[in-house]
Structure formats: C-alpha cells, structure tokens
Amino acid sequence: MAKGQSLQDPFLNALRRERIPVSIYLVNGIKLQGQVESFDQFVILLKNTVSQMVYKHAISTVVPARPVAHHTAPAAGDSDSQSEE
C-alpha cells in the first residue's frame, strides 16, 4: 500500500462514515460542497442535491466542517509527524 493511501483512506472513510459535510477545493479554484458518499483510488463521489464524481487529481484541498477523528498511527521512522519547532 502506498504511503499516500495510508493517509487518504482513513481520512476519507471517517468523513464518509460520520457523514461530515466537506468543502472540496479544486485546482482551478472551484469550491464543491457536500458529503463523501464513497471513494476509490482515483475518484470521490460527493453527494449534495446531486451526486458528483470528482477526480482526485483535480482536488487541491478537502476541508471538513468539523474535526475528524481518523485513527492513524505514524509510520516507523516518520519523524515529521510528531516534530515541533
């Protein structure tokens, strides 16, 4: 499993399970809002008044409406996850 997936999947899964409203900003500046209905390696299905399939490569930022408890343990040797300056 790729390192990126180990962060994405638990985060998106928590958003889906808890039905947390999200704002998704695309690389072209467009803001989409809704709830994560499902996702896979390449797309997120976002539900609002309609369902939209959003390609992950077009996403800049995912902003939850409230804090998300996504239980991920830092990988061994991942020094920047706990560092403070």
Curated annotation (Swiss-Prot):
Q: Where is the Sm domain?
A: 9-68
Tell me its family.
Belongs to the Hfq family.
Q: Which residue ranges run through the membrane?
A: none
Q: Which UniProt keywords apply?
A: RNA-binding, Stress response
Q: What's the protein called, per UniProt?
A: RNA-binding protein Hfq
Biological processes annotated in GO: regulation of DNA-templated transcription; regulation of RNA stability; regulation of translation, ncRNA-mediated
Molecular function terms from GO: RNA binding
NCBIfam families cross-referenced by the UniProt entry: Hfq, PRK00395.1
User: What does the UniProt function comment say about this protein?
Assistant: RNA chaperone that binds small regulatory RNA (sRNAs) and mRNAs to facilitate mRNA translational regulation in response to envelope stress, environmental stress and changes in metabolite concentrations. Also binds with high specificity to tRNAs.
PANTHER family annotated for this entry?
RNA-BINDING PROTEIN HFQ
For this record, an example GO cellular component is: cytosol
* Subunit structure as annotated in this protein's UniProt entry: Homohexamer.
